[in-house]
Amino acid sequence: MRKRKFAFAASMLAVSTLVLAACSDVEEGGATTDTGGGGTNAAAQCAGDPITIAVNPWVGAEANAAVAQAVMQNEMGCTVELQEINESGQFPAMASGDVDATLEVWPSGHLKDRRDYIEKAGDVVDGGELGITGNIGWFMPSYLVEENPDLATWEGFKENADAFATAETGDKGRFLGADTTYSIFDEAIIASLGLDLEVVYSGSEAASLAALDKAYNSQEPILMYWWTPQWANAKYDLVEVELPAYNEECGAIAAEDPDAAVGYNCDYAEDVLYKAFSAGLETKDPAAFEFFSNFTWTEEDQNAVALSIQEGTDPAEAAQAWIDENADVVEGWLPAPS
């Protein structure tokens, strides 16, 4: 999950396109090999033009896209391109038609995008719920709360922030942020609550995990931006810090100015994850539109594929292994042949 927004032109400089034709697998050196494709004709077939899925920079989003690509390849004869793109770039890319679909939107960080692109302009459409409820917040290992129960709430950091200090932050406690393109309001929360914490951005999900693993194994203090669902939550015993309850005022701030979020002083909103599509997708490829609309799965499903990818399995192989074990779920996604 998650993002601080940048201007579209700047964010697209960070976009890396992975053109993975759905009938091909990428080998070492960047070469591709034909894997057949063509579909089984048991489902409606794609229209022929490539379908582009946005892949945000966290492994859960990669799992969504890998499974969708594999099913569309094998069952619907589609050509699918996976495009790595920051959260901040995905709505403009769908509006322009450069991206056809994103399969995981965290709404708390996209209130302004929803208003501008879905409700006002109408060049992006809501694709329905993904089937997963997410939660962003402040997390720490449970051993810290066991040692000092005051840390269970934000008020405990009024007196204990210095326990999280590092050489980088001096007298202030370190708050470990993640990728700067995620949905992040922590600087505003810290300022609004008057806490002696400094946000230090890890730069990526992988870097945050490495920092967590190091601290956890040494039983050291760490306070971090984190979220559920996330496969690592089964590995580490984490506790979420209680922040002031989310309210409409915070929602209005996030919708109006998500970059600065000045005055945002509460928890993140609960996120019912949803999908979003280019408004032109239904006309471009009705079968792909119906498939994406039908695509839903559970936190457990996503975590199974994400963990396999994280452990080094090729995403296509991880996706296919899950598909082979969940044929009944996949069948429910397929559009009926016309």
Features from the language model and the residues they span:
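An extracytoplasmic/periplasmic, membrane-proximal ligand-sensing/linker region
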Residues: D49, G60, Y182-E198, S202-Q219, ...
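A conserved helix-loop-strand patch within extracytoplasmic ligand-binding domains
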Residues: G122-F175
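Bacterial signal peptide processing site
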Residues: S24-E27
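A bilobed periplasmic-binding-protein/Venus flytrap-type ligand-binding module shared by bacterial periplasmic
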Residues: N135-E146, V272-K284, L307-S308
